[in-house]
């Protein structure tokens, strides 16, 4: 699949082929709900299209045979006209939030492409492609059930990559208060897991 980077699906695994021309460029990830369980917490997050979170990342070549992903914060910034832009860049270190071993490196003319396996990272519970800890608290979810969570579809387009996942969570005991507890007891027992369909958009 050709998008702003190539996506390969081989033997049940998703491989991203990142060109070095994308290194250092901002990629926005926006997470939204597609479907949600019938649950009292739905009024907080749960209707189709409900916003979950967003973050900006950058890919970069790490040391050795690794590719790094940094989470980018713009809490501190400065306009070029103030002559402070480079000083701000030099005084802030953006965190490395993920590292991936290189599966292969491929040359295309002047471009070098780096291939990484993203399957487990996307499928497992992490804030880049799933709920933040704050949202999980709000919806009464705790740990993710691995064998009931999976990547549904992954599609590549020229300006975006669309990832749809199904994620099942254990229900947090004692979540919510007052009316929320009463409604939760009406809709489901405290041991009923919560299954969500989520969509993650990676935008260049």
Q: What function would you assign to each model-found segment?
A:
Residues 1-204:
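Auxiliary tRNA-acceptor-end handling modules of aminoacyl-tRNA synthetases
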């Amino acid at each position: 699949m050709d998008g702003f980077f190539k996506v390969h699906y081989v033997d049940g695994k998703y491989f991203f082929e990142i060109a070095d021309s994308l290194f250092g460029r901002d990629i926005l990830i926006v997470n939204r709900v597609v479907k949600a369980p019938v649950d009292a917490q739905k009024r907080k997050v749960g209707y189709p299209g409900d916003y979950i979170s967003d973050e900006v990342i950058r890919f970069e070549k790490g040391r050795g045979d690794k590719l790094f992903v940094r989470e980018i914060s713009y809490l501190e910034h400065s306009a070029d006209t103030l002559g402070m832009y480079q000083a701000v860049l030099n005084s802030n270190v953006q965190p490395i939030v993920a590292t991936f071993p290189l599966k292969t490196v491929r040359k295309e003319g002047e471009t070098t492409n780096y291939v990484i396996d993203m399957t487990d990272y996307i499928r497992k519970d992490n804030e880049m492609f799933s709920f933040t800890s704050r949202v999980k608290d709000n919806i009464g979810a705790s740990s993710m059930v691995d064998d009931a969570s999976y990547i549904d579809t992954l599609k590549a387009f020229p300006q975006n990559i669309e990832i749809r996942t199904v994620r099942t969570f254990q229900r947090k005991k004692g979540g919510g208060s007052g009316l929320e507890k009463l409604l939760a007891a009406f809709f489901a027992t405290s041991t009923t897991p919560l299954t969500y369909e989520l969509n993650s958009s990676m935008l260049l």
